Structures are given as C-alpha cells and as structure tokens.
Amino acid sequence: MNLYLLLLVIATSSWQFVAGLECPVECTCDKKGLVVDCSSSGLTRIPKNISRNVRSLVIRNNRIHKLKRSDLEGFNQLETLVLTHNKIKIIEENVLDHLPELKRLSLAHNELVYIPPLCSDSRPLASLNLKRNHIQFIDEQVLRYFPDLTQLDFSHNRIQSLRTKLFDNLPALSHAHLHSNPWHCDCRASKVKALLQKVKWEKKVYCTNPVELRHQALDEVDDSALTCARPAEESWTGEEIKLTCAKNSSSKLVVWMYENVEVDSSSLDGYEIHDTVITVPRKTNVNFMTCTYDFDHIPHHRRLRQSQHQGNGSPQFTYKPRDNSFREGSEVKVNCEVMGNPKPTINWYHNGKRFISSRKRQLGLSNNVLRIYPFLEEDSGRYTCEAVNSVGKVRHAFSLDLISSVPPNIYEGPQSVSQNLGGSVVFVCKANGNPVPDYTWSFDGSTIGHIKGRFMVSDDGTELRISNIEKKDEGYYSCMAGNPVGAMSADAKLTVIGGETRKAAAPQIDEELLRAIAQKARQNVENAVEKTRKQLTQDKVTNTNDLKRLFRFSTPKQAVELSKAREIYEESVRLVREHVEKGLILNVDELHPKNVSYESVLHVTHVQALMGLSGCHTGQYKNPCTDTCFHHRYRSFDGQCNNKNKPMTGVSLMPLRRLLKPVYENGFNTPVGWEKGRLYNGYPLPNVREVSRQLVATENITPHSKLSSMVMQWGQFVDHDLTHTVTALSRHSYATGAFCNRTCENLDPCFNIPLSPNDPRVKSGSAKYPCIEFERSAAVCGSGETSLVFNRVTYREQMNALTSFLDASNVYGSNEVQAQELRDTYNNNGMLRFDITSEAGKEYLPFEKDSNMDCRRNFSEENPIRCFLAGDLRANEQLALAATHTIFIREHNRIAKKLKSMNGNWDGEIIYHETRKIVGAMMQHITYKHWMPIIFGGQAQMNKFVGTYQGYDPDVDASVTNAFATAAFRFGHTIINPSLFRLGNDFMPIKEGHIALHKAFFTPELVLTQGGVDPLLRGLFASPLKHPMPTQLLNMELIEKLFMKGHEVSLDLAVMNIQRSRDHGLPSYTEYRKFCNLPVPVQWEDMKGYIKDDMIIQKLRGLYGVPQNIDLWVGGIVEEKLENGLFGPTFACIIGEQFRKIRDGDRFWYEKDGVFTPEQLREIKKITLARLFCDNGDNIDRIQKDVFMYPGMDKENYGTCQETEMMNLRAWSKCCDNVCPTMLDRILRSRHRGSRLHGCNQNGIWRPEGAKWIPQNEICTECVCQGSRVWCSTKEDCSDNRSPF
C-alpha cells in the first residue's frame, strides 16, 4: 500500500510538472490548458510552449509585429484567437490554414494596411474583427471560405472601396460594421449599400468622395448617384481598343470595371492595363466599360472646405448638426463646421446657457466637434452652435433627445407542469423590452448554464429543456429577463410523478401576487414622494424645516433614484408579509444577518423578482479608468479610479462601510425601538427625547480656556467634505399616506419621536403635533462590486452622497454635473463661478438659480435672496459655514489667477484641475497637521489612534463608516456655542450684535447685509469654543430651537443623532468598546472607570436599564475625554480608524511621493488657515498664527497678517506643460467609456462592468461585460483596451 501511495504521489507530481511546462511564464492558463491568456506580457511573437489543446488564446496588448502561419501550427482545436492591441503590420497569406476549428478571430487595434487571403479552404469562422487598423486594401478572397461568418467589423480604418465580389457567398452574415472609413461612393459602393440593407450595423456609413456626396449616408444615397466614369478617350489600333480614364491630381491607381465588376474578376479576356489606359479586344462592348479610382490623400473634410473659401467673409456653415436621439449612457458626437475669414470662433450652448470643454462635454478641433459621454437625461435638450468673427455671426440650433428605454416585460412565462420520471419538459420565457432583454434561468436559486448536463437553454435564452427527469429535479424554475434598465422574473414549479416524495414546500407565493405587490409598493412610494414634492413647492416653503426637506430634491437625481428603488423593494417585502400567515419574529440575541431569513417566507427566486420589479438592479455609472494620464494626475469628481484595483472604493452614492454588522429588529430593515413595548436585555429602549432632555441638554455652558470656535467650524467643514447621508424623499407613510408628524406610528419612512405628557413643549402648549418628525435615511440597494441580485434578503444600508476622500468635494462637488455648475464657463480661466462681489471686490458664492431651493425664511422680507451655491448642498445651513465656503471660492480664484499669469500657455482646464489639486492638499494639510492634533489632545495621542503616514496602501478601503458618520464624528455637536459671535475690525461686536444660533440657520442674506464674511470669521477665531463637559453637552439652541419657526415643532439635534443611529442599525455603545479592545461594562459599577460623574451613571441607568442598551452616540459623548482632547477613547478609536484609512487609502494624498514635487510640497506645508483668512477676507489684518487656539478678547493678542507665512506659487511655474491629451483642444481626445454600476447578468452570475470570463462548458467562447451587456464574440464594441476582444 505504501509503495502504491508513493507511486501515486510521483505520478501526480510528474503530471503537474508536465502541465506546468505547457503554460508559458508570460501567460495564465486554466487547469486543463484550454484557456490561455498572455495579455500585457511584452511578447513579440506567439509563445511556442502553449498547449496544443488550447481552445481560447488571448494575446492582447503585446508587441507582435508579424503573424506567420508557422506561429499557429498545431492549434487544431483553437476556437477563439484574440490578438488585439499589438503592432501587427503583416499577416502571411492563408495564415488560418492550421486552425481548422477557429470560430472567432480579432486583430483589432493593430497596424495592418493590407489583408491577404486568410485561408485556402473552408473554415467555420463566425466572427472577424479588423477594427481600428490602417487597412486600405482587402483581397477579394478574404471572406471566400467563411460560409458561417455572422459578424464582421471593418470600422475605423482607411478603406475607400471594397472589391465588388468580397461579400458574395456569405449567407450567414447578420452584423457588419463598416463605419468610420473614407468611403468613395462610386459604382463599387452599390454592393456595400446592398449589404447594409440586409444586415444590422452599429453606425451609419458616410461618403467622403465624390465631393457632391460628401457627408451623405450611403444607405440614403440614390442608386443612380453611385456611378463610375465613362472612359475619357477611345482609340482603335488593329484588333484592339485603347480606353483612357481621366484622373485628377489627388487620385492614385485607376480601377477599370467591366459590367460593374473589377476587370480582373470579370468575364473580360485579353486586356492590358498601363496606368490610366486599358487595351481590350476590338470585339469588347465598351459600353460596359467604366473606370474609377481611389485617392492618395484624403484631406479632412473641415480643412478641405475651408480651403475653398476665398477672401474675407462672415461665418457660413459648411456642415450643420441635425436633430438626433441617443440612448442613456451612450457616447454622442456632434460636428458643427464653418468657414469664414477671419477664422470664426465657435461657441456652444445648451438650453441657452454657454458651456466650455470639460470632462463630460469635450470640445475638439477648435470647438468644431462636441463629444458627450455618458449621455444622460440632463444632457438632452436644445443645443446651439454659434460661429463668430469680426465680420459677423451665425447660429444653428438642434435638439439632442434621450431615447426612452423600456424594462423587460415577460408576456409569455413558464407554466407549472407535472411530468413522469425519465420524461422531458420545456419551459418557455419570452419578454419585450428595449434594448432586447437577455435571459437567465435558475433552479431553486442556482443558475443553469446554457448547457448543463440534462439541462439545455436555447441559443436565444427563451427556452429551458430538461431531459431524463429525475426526482431531484422537482422544484421551482425561474426565468429572469434583464436589460440595462431593469429586470423581470417569472417562475414555475416542476412536479415529478413517481419516486420518493419531496419535503412539503413552504407556503406558495406566485408570480401574479409578486407583480401585484411590487406594483402596489411602487405606487405607495411614488405617491408619498409626490405628495411631499407638491407640498414643498417654492410658494409653500415658509420655514427652515420645510427648506431642509426641499434639499432632498436637490440631491443628484441618481441618488434619488437609487434610494427610491430600495424603498420600493423594502415596501414590497413589507407587503409580502401581509400576505403570509407566518411573520418574522426573532429574539434580541438573534439580531444578526446570518440568522435572518425572509427566505422562510420568500423563496430566493421571489427575492430576485422583487429586486427586479422594484428597480434595485440599477446603479451608478462606473468609470473604466482607461484615461490613465488624467487619472494618474487628477481626481475624478465622484472618487472613481482613485484606487486602481478597486475603482469604486470611496465613491459617492455608495453604501457607508460597516465596522460591525447592523442590528435591525427583524434583521432586515426595521430599527431597534420600532416595535413599541419590546424589551432589550430585559428593558425597553428609552424614548430618545427623554434621553435628550434628562441627559444631554444644558442651559449652562463653559467656555474653553484654550481653544477657539474655529475648531468647531473646521470640523463641520471637514464633515461636509466626507459625509452626507441622503434622507428619505417622502414625509408621508408609504403604507397609509399619512403625514409623518401627524402620527407617532412607525410606518416607513416615518420613525417619529413621541412627546411625553411632561415634555416642556407639551406643557407650554407650543407643540402643534404629538411627536417630533423624523424620516429615515434613504436606503441603497447595494454597492455593485459584487452582486446586486442578492441570493437572500439583505439588510438595509445607507448611502453616502459624497466621496469618502478628503478632496474638497464641498468646494467642487461630488459629481461632474455639480462641478460644472460651479465653474465659470464664460471665460476659459479655470475659475469658479460668482455673481456678486463685496465692497472689497472679492467674490461671494454664486446664487442657486436653476431649482426650487429658496433660502427666504420670511417671504415678507425686503430684498430676499436665493441660496448660495457650493460644492455641498448644506453651505447655507448657518452663517459661519457659508463664510467658510466663501473663503474657499476666493482662494481657488486667487490661485487660478496667479497660475494663469505665470503660465500663459495653460488653458482653463489645466488651471482648474491644478488649482483644485492645490486646494484639496490645503484641506488635507490643515486638517491633519493643525486641527486633528487638537481634537485628539496632542500629537502623541493622535499618532496612537491614527498612526503616522507610511505611504499609499491600495488594500485600504477609505470608505466612510456608518459609525463615524452617524455617531462618532457628531461629537462636534457638543462644542457648539448657542450664539455666533460677530466681531468688527476692532474685535468688538458689530452694531447688529452677535446672533442666536437658531436665527442663523438658512439666512444667507445676513452675510451680505450685515458686514460680509469678516465679522463671522473673527467671531470664529476670536471667541472661545464651548467646552464639552459631560454635564454640559448640547446647548438649548440645539435642543429646543433647532430650525425653530414659531408655531411648528422645532427639532432636537440630540434626538436626531440618537434616532439616526437606531435607524442605521448601529450596535450599542458596549459593542463598539469591544470592537476597540476597550473594557466592556457588564454592570453599572464597571463604568466608573471611564465615566467619573456618578450622576451621569445614575441617569444612564434610569434611562437604559443595562449598559448593553446604551446608544453609541450617547455613550461616546459622556465618556471621560482623552487628556486635553474633545472626546473619549471609543470615539477616538472610530475617528482614528476613519482618518487613518482616508489618508492611507488615498492615491492622491498630498504627502504621497509623486503627487507634488518636493518644491511644491514644501510650499503646501506653509499653508495655515490664518493665511487663507488674510488673503481672502475683505479686510482681515490681525489674526493669531494658529486660528484653532484662543488668545483672548484683547485685540493686541492678535498678530498681523504680515507675520503669517505665505505659500509661493512659483513652484507651479511651467510645472505641468506636458499635459494629458484629453485636456487639450485637439482631435486626440480619449473616449471616456463608462458603464452602469449594475454590470451584466450572464447565466445568473452578476459581473461588474469590464469583467471578462470564459463561460463554463463553452470553452470556445470568451465574454466581456460592456455597456451592461454581455458580448461573447471577438467583435469590439468599445475601445476600452481592457476588453479581451
């Protein structure tokens, strides 16, 4: 036995050794050697030691220059060959003779000029891709031996004409892409036109020559216009006739035609050709003889037209764009061409508003070409191309509309059947939709491949056939039809007659009930949202509370739709419970996702169906990060492409990260405290209003002896750069439609806080309604990095609308559209937009003009103004915050002007991105070097919790955590003063005096009418911070007067914080102490080590019963603070973890090698907030060097601005002349291919955009997810060089 085992080990090792030799070191291979990928390996030839059994060979992105027959010898089973993105210039004739089974060939993105015959006998080739080469000539025999060819791509080459017999004998051809070639539309083009009328194509084929047909679509040209020339001269010599063809100076080889076929392929015999002359037998019928030619040089049509223009003249259009429609997410290219002398300048307008070149809307060829990607709803509308010179001006308007896509609708679904053992059955599933849906079949939640044993799915996916039925085949079969805008599922049950009886199934929920439930859920949510929207139209916004609700509709539309989809999904699940006898009741100690299961009620196929019906398959657009130059240098606005390995890390509109798994009452979505009277660890959770009143509220405050109020304000500014949790859009219950604050029932999205009879608001009679209104945070379907079609019900997650990086997104915005709204588009100077300036000539934030947001608190006020517009929607929340935002728009514009003066060759795009990069570095430096050591109580304690910077780590997830955003970083509420100080130049109160906090909310007019930003800034750096004492936590302005308006129930910030943490499913304070490796209290006596005040412990005990019930935010703010710090160890742990990951996981961190030059970094490290105030205040001349430290009230304690160090921008002089091609106004502009976050569903497996794979049991096929569709051929549907095709 031992000898046998030894021989077995030796044999196995030997096999592994031999197998290893069959996979070259430059390649990756599957275990059987059937799939070999040698991409991006620097190869100059095809490796010799590849297994000859290989079925799929990918050698993309290498340096191969020539393809020889000998390179492919022996690959008798090869079905897919991908050689894209090489340097191939030559391929040998009949190169495919050694590949008898080849079905897919891609030679796209090479340097081929001539294509010779590819094989000498018949081959089963189905797909041929020659896209993006330099092809001018294609031999007539190239396609002769491919009767099975279905897909052909000759696009983006230099083809002027094709041989007339090239397309003969191609009975299976269904797709041909011939666009983006300089076609000569002569008699030869009639065969191309005929082909286009038979097959499907991607884009229209346009004529380049002759001039009279230029820019006309070939399929629209009349056949009579597709002609070749009659011979110019005829002469007879004996038995011969000489014919001469006229030829112009730009033409090259003349082509002679006989009966509209090239003479060398025609029935004509005995001819001789000498340049422009052909000699034919005298008996030839010369009436059938014509000639044509191709051109040596094809001048770009724009330059050609301009060369025809003589003398001075006003602009004239030579090509006008036409009205057109495009699908959502597609790339749009529009040409607008003019001539005139002097050369006209072209300007572009969208819905009457001028725009300049940007990442979203790129202008090329001196603004002649407009490219938009991705084309979304906000891009549709009326566009105007305007051409201006000193002689005159012309304008042309046209419309670009969005083609509405239609989600799938299954009109013929599978039917439940019974069948005997050994029999067979066919399930049918057919759906309408636009684009055409793809189909995925599953059995009891497990995906069925196209060919899987006894299971077979038809080629179009509409039929599932099961043969030789066994008892184990009994169960539910589900069909999912999906396209980029939605999905729909239908299922049926197979009952097998005979054999052992299967376990009784759970109560049934059929497809009809699911569809009705989803429709009712959508109606409930949509009605509730619409009611709220109507109530908050501009003429009904009468107070700041309404204003905050209206802000919800100003968040990006994408965020609105993502959160709405999840709400519909959850409402659907709630309605399902109403139809099921068995509810879901779990013990408190079972509140953990892995224990949950709505599957006890909902089958996995039903979960998938509800996800599709609710819209939970959609997601945010995903950037493939192919513009390596730009993404190496600059951040994207939404955070994508920061982490090259995980490009969606830290991106806006993504779920908050979890430190601990959430705790929901039902394990799915309902917060703890949702079910009234429920006990937790033997005690009911306290009413959060009572926690606020008894424990958190304080009428007395103690000023901090060392720190200024700027500590608080910078903290809020940083928070608004990192976190913004989107709230529910509706104030109405989805289930009943009741107004949220009219009832204290917990009905989504309402999670209101009842007021007790002894509440001061009730006793005083000021409470108009019985509870404080609270709407839950909007939920998000999923992250998109894995599957959005979950195999089980997933717990509720909340969305961060901002990027998680410290990147000045509160200045510039967290998406492309928002960023463009903030830019000055009328001048190409890289500056931010402003509308008015102060008396000192310095900019104020621009006014919000294009939405219903309005900051008028009292409509009877004189000169009411609209909201200020900034990168964060909350810029108007209070006056000091608006002043801080103002400083940063001024700083951006100050730097932009200096960079422009030093670098006259820079355009606005370069100036903007370089300035944005500098301002982002300023925020990072001030936060980490000046502010954070203060809040942690010193550099040593900061290093303990945050650590020192060791360089960028791509494995770090910088995403903001739910605990940080919802609880820990809200420690800042304990250091807010009840008033905003406003100090004049003499450091005395201005004549209007200080302002109570509740009067400072959403009042931007006071910035303009009461002294500008200077009094507010002095009030921050020259007033003391509120000391966060455990017995003095939140001042009464925040407890009783938050967003107060006379007759309404004002909010309570402590209540909001505690209720929000429950809404988000945050575990208790003790669980986070355990996470942080801190002592965990079991009894109340255990807490005396870190809560020194016995009275506080007694209050906690009276409210919570046991330490295990304490809410995280409450426990965190009453903890004993770190020495000289502003919070205790639990919050220090959570905040430290977050700021460490924000820094270490940021590829653009300002201290990372290569982000800035050493000289630039030295200058950035000189930056202080004091210097920013000096440079950008209206008249700030005295200030302390460290604005976070409070020197006292005496003006003499403040130094002069001359004493603060300045940053020298000379380090940026000519630093960036070598800019990325995508930032230049040239024809060389990358096409920023993106996609939708939801990716592709293939065989039930969800794959992210850009993923590539070999389907199981289909070795000959190689697939890529592109544009939310699965492409399983060598046809290239985009130029993204990550594609395997």
Curated annotation (Swiss-Prot):
Its cofactor is Ca(2+); heme b. Keywords: Calcium, Coiled coil, Disulfide bond, Extracellular matrix, Glycoprotein, Heme, Hydrogen peroxide, Immunoglobulin domain, Iron, Leucine-rich repeat, Metal-binding, Oxidoreductase, Peroxidase, Repeat, Secreted, Signal. Residues 180-228 form the LRRCT domain. Expressed in the ventral nerve cord, the dorsal nerve cord, head neurons, GABAergic and cholinergic neurons, body wall muscles, vulval muscles, uterine muscles, intestine, the hypodermis and in coelomocytes. Binds 1 Ca(2+) ion per subunit. Binds 1 heme b (iron(II)-protoporphyrin IX) group covalently per subunit. It catalyses: L-lysyl-[collagen] + L-methionyl-[collagen] + H2O2 = [collagen]-L-lysyl-N-S-L-methionyl-[collagen] + 2 H2O + H(+); bromide + H2O2 = hypobromite + H2O; L-lysyl-[collagen] + L-methionyl-[collagen] + hypobromite = [collagen]-L-lysyl-N-S-L-methionyl-[collagen] + bromide + H2O + H(+); L-tyrosyl-[protein] + bromide + H2O2 + H(+) = 3-bromo-L-tyrosyl-[protein] + 2 H2O. Residues 21-53 form the LRRNT domain. LRR repeats lie at residues 27-49, 50-72, 73-96, 97-120, 122-143, 145-168, 204-227, 998-1022, 1049-1073, 1168-1189. The record marks 874 as: Transition state stabilizer. Residues 305-324 are annotated as: Disordered. Its EC number is 1.11.2.-. Disulfide bonds join 336-385, 429-479, 625-641, 740-750, 744-771, 1076-1133, 1174-1201. Residues 315-401, 408-495 form the Ig-like C2-type domain. Pfam families: An_peroxidase, I-set, LRR_8, LRRNT. InterPro entries: Cys-rich_flank_reg_C, Haem_peroxidase_animal, Haem_peroxidase_sf, Haem_peroxidase_sf_animal, Ig-like_dom, Ig-like_dom_sf, Ig-like_fold, Ig_I-set. It is found in: Secreted, Extracellular space, Extracellular matrix. One of its GO terms (biological process) is response to oxidative stress. GO terms for cellular component: basement membrane; extracellular matrix; extracellular space. Residues 1-20 form the signal peptide. Residues 307-317 have a biased composition (Polar residues). One of its GO terms (molecular function) is heme binding. It is an enzyme of class 1 (oxidoreductase). Catalyzes the two-electron oxidation of bromide by hydrogen peroxide and generates hypobromite as a reactive intermediate which mediates the formation of sulfilimine cross-links between methionine and hydroxylysine residues within an uncross-linked collagen IV NC1 hexamer. Plays a role in the attachment of tissues and in axonal guidance during early developmental stages. May functionally antagonize the peroxidasin pxn-2 to maintain neuronal development. Belongs to the peroxidase family. XPO subfamily. This is Peroxidasin homolog pxn-1.
